[in-house]
Amino acid sequence: MSFRASVSGGPGRMAPMERTIDLRSDTVTQPTHSMRRAMAEAAVGDDVYGEDPTVNRLEERAAALMERESALLVPSGTMANQIAVNLLSRRGQEVIGESRCHIFNFEHGAMAAISGALPHPIETANGILHPDQLRTAYLPPGGHTNSSCMVALENTHNLAGGRVVPPARMDELVGTAGELGLPVHLDGARIHNAAAAVGVSAARLARGCDTVMFCLSKGLGAPVGSLLIGDRELIAEARVVRKMLGGGMRQAGVLAAAGLVAFDEVLPRLADDHATARRLAELIAEVAGILLDPATVETNIICFALDGSAGMTAAELADRLGEKGVLASALGANLVRMVTHYHITMPDAEAAAAALREVVAERATG
């Protein structure tokens, strides 16, 4: 049985299309009609000269959204993270972060290769650091060991299943880092999902962090871009590092235009994606051989494990789901990730769960 769906809807009214149910990531989103129109009509200039009016508007809105002085558009979240590390770290010193964070695991060792910084990973049960763990990990300058230079936080935490670091814990971590004399960078690729989940502003969650970045091309649905945000002096330095890394773009207003539409059309409805994810999680949890507590699904990411009775690896499960028109990501031997976004409807969630149930049942009957 195929679970491919024909849908029409989403912000800006996506054109109807026959498609698979793509739950691999929220990066698979297609630009809305409104985004495409805004991109085609965008006023542009040379952004390396600071002359692209649409980029300037996007950066001003992003800075205001985060209640900061300045923002910088860069091609990707990885580049934004690496610019921040370059500005806040020192060669041969350690960046303290949760062991599964994106900066440590999905950026190909860039902080070591580019900035000479070393990871100091801290393991947690749920992706959320405790201030005492920062104190224990901290290494002062001097002596015979590496020393700590900064703290990297992630909110929401991708590999922890989209868990939200709540405002009070963010305050504690930022405060502890300050006591230790360490600057803080927040990888807020999905910070707007975190904000929607706990009912506060993204600026509130990032309060006190020296730099914060968020992505336009995940749940917000724009095709390209992330923003690095901080004080005016730091972002002026970031502009130089962006150029060094090859991230200076010319008529980038065609990309920035989609981001402006995302702020208006997509950001206000992120909670809908969370509701879809919760429903999908509830249905997945009913499938034999699946280990998942739906209460842990706080945003748009679902991570579930396979127990021994499932009789297959995560990769095998993902392959069989793909044959039924449902795409998911295998993370290691027994962990599967699904991510909802504005293309995924409640009927899609139900169809995806039905496909999963069918795959597991087929395996059980041999």
Question: Residues of each region from the PLM?
Answer:
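Short, positively charged and aromatic/hydrophobic N-terminal segments
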Residues: 9-14
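Conserved PLP-enzyme active-site core in the AAT-like
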Residues: 3-4, 15-324, 329-344, 350-366
